[in-house]
Amino acid sequence: MEIRVVPFDHPDAVKLIDLVQQEYVTRYGDPDVTPVDPAQFSPPHGIFLVGYRDGVPVACGGWRAHDGPVPTFRPGDAELKRMFVVDTERGNGFARAMLAQLERTALAAGRRRAVLETGTEQPEAIALYRSSGYTDIPGFGVYKDEPESVYLAKELKES
């Protein structure tokens, strides 16, 4: 998989974001309504990545900077958003590759911790994050009081 930096509103990113929102509807009954400003995913305060296999967009993910004062966030945090791999490409290691690239770019931009929210209806995502060193943190954002929300973080370090 070739991973490229693209704008959040790039046609390939929009296509994949639409698919991830459909996935949320299937799993949770509604799309993610967390406010997202595309400008937050532009360097140096964020990034959005699309993964391509043979020129076809198959995966995406991004991060946006958080420096407080929102509870749970710390100065230097990067919030991961819209991690997704299309159904037909799952099991090929693309999610792990995308996660690693998001962590590398966040660290290179001076971010010290990656934080994210996922849900109990995405056990494969939870397994990926936990196996990559993510641990539980207090909830934040729109879904912080939802029992099916899972909040995780990982300290970013040079490897």
Region locations from a protein language model:
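Conserved GNAT acetyl-CoA-binding A-motif
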Residues: 99, 106-118
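Conserved amphipathic alpha-helical interaction elements at protein-protein interfaces in regulatory
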Residues: 91, 104-108, 135
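Active-site acidic-Proline motif in GNAT/NAT acetyltransferases
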Residues: 86-88, 92, 120
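Conserved catalytic-core motifs of GNAT/GCN5-like acyltransferases
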Residues: 8, 115-118, 126, 130-151
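Conserved G/P- and acidic residue-centered "switch" motifs that form tight phosphate/ATP-binding loops
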Residues: 55, 93, 110
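Conserved catalytic core of two-component sensor histidine kinases
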Residues: 123
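Acetyl-CoA-dependent GNAT
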Residues: 1-81, 86-88, 99-101, 105, ...
